[in-house]
C-alpha cells in the first residue's frame, strides 16, 4: 500500500 498507514510505519 501507499496510503496513510504506510506513511505512518516509517
Swiss-Prot record:
Thermal dependence of catalysis: Optimum temperature below 60 degrees Celsius. Active from 0 to 100 degrees Celsius.
GO-annotated biological processes: defense response to bacterium; defense response to fungus; killing of cells of another organism
Protein activity control: Inhibited by sodium ion, potassium ion, magnesium ion, calcium ion, Cu(2+) ion, zinc ion and Fe(3+) ion.
GO terms assigned for molecular function: hydrolase activity
Keywords for this protein: Antibiotic, Antimicrobial, Fungicide, Hydrolase
Purpose of the protein: Has ribonuclease activity towards yeast tRNA and polyuracil and weak ribonuclease activity towards other polyhomoribonucleotides. Has weak deoxyribonuclease activity. Displays antimitogenic activity towards murine splenocytes and antiproliferative activity towards HepG2 hepatoma cells and L1210 leukemia cells. Has antibacterial activity against Gram-negative bacteria P.aeruginosa and P.fluorescens, and the Gram-positive bacterium S.aureus.
Self-association state and partner proteins as the record states: Monomer.
Name recorded for this polypeptide: Antimicrobial ribonuclease
Species of origin: Pleurotus sajor-caju (Oyster mushroom)
Lineage: Eukaryota, Fungi, Dikarya, Basidiomycota, Agaricomycotina
Amino acid at each position: 500500500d501507499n496510503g496513510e498507514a504506510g506513511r505512518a510505519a516509517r
